[in-house]
Amino acid sequence: MRVVTTPLPDVLVFLPTPHRDDRGFFTRTFDTEIFDAAVAEHTGLDVRSADFRQDSQSRSAAGVLRGLHGRGGRGETKLVRCARGAVQDVVVDARPDSPARGRSHAVVLDDVDFAHLLVPPGFLHGFLTLSDTADVCYRIDRPHDPTEDVGVR
């Protein structure tokens, strides 16, 4: 699994290495040691793999735009991947004191490369469905609390 830094601080992309043959493929979608080492080396985040508390999944039809969403309070850390289909995924730095505030980064998440996007606390997140349908999976470090939801409409 490769780890790629992005132009935004604390935002990482994890790229698994699928093993393909005539039967299909096999890939590791999460590795605690790689995740923890990458976060420690490339970010200032105080999150470890053991901190994740909830996995969620959404299914979206072609052309659906979800977001931009975030979480108030102390925020949340999300690890996002597309298990089926493809999405154009976007994060926006909304941290009040960040020198990168207002800057965005986009990446295609799909069921070919299986990239994962690390979305830090204080960032807004959204995606546009590029395929007929897309299943997006979220690994989150705090259970959802609707009273902390923030977003741009």
Describe the function of each predicted region.
Residues V90, L117, H125-L130:
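Short beta-strand His + acidic residue motifs that chelate non-heme Fe in jelly-roll/DSBH
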